[in-house]
Amino acid sequence: NNYGIEVDIKKDLSFIGLPNFSWSFNGALIKSRVNFSGTTLMENRPMQGQSPYLVNTGIFYKNEKLQLDAALLYNRIGKRIIGVGRSEGTTSGNEALRVPDSYEMPRDVLDLSVSKKFGTHWEVKANIRDILAQRVYYKEFVTATLNDGTTKKVEQITRSFKPGRNIGLSITYKL
């Protein structure tokens, strides 16, 4: 099952004294459920790869006279399953066979792009992708049994990497 709500807004900002600017927003709340029995740790879990929310927003600048365009874009997605766990064999009490679901954790992504035309033939474009360059974290959430028999919820990082910024520059000549 998959259901949700999405909002999409686009607004020219000239009403606040910014005649060449516009703003856009897209956001969604999604509820997804897949039902399994016996093969995963969670019999009723979110769909793999489906975020419970996403936010995209941006400020855009467009000046026809100067032939200049710019955009500052923000994106965030919610925690999502990237690897489905398994629980086969856990009925015998062998906890070593339990593999929890693996989640990609939310992070903020900010992009900037600028393009400028020179006459009718030349265009220069520059962009920076992932300005914030936040780390990507994959985590598992497990319940550990301590020596005294009590249980404790544990969050463990299974993978972490920093994708880094991407910077681009292009010069185009159109015939």
Model features per residue range: what roles?
Residues 7, 25, 59, 72, ...:
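Hydrophobic, well-ordered secondary-structure elements that form the walls
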Residues 52-56, 109, 166:
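Transmembrane beta-barrel architecture of outer membranes
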Residues 1-84:
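Gram-negative outer-membrane beta-barrel transporters
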Residues 76-90, 116-175:
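C-terminal beta-signal and adjacent terminal beta-strands/loops
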Residues 91-95:
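Charged, glycine/proline-rich intrinsically disordered loops and linkers
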Residues 39-46, 96-101, 111, 154-159:
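Extracellular loop and loop/strand-boundary signature of outer-membrane beta-barrel proteins
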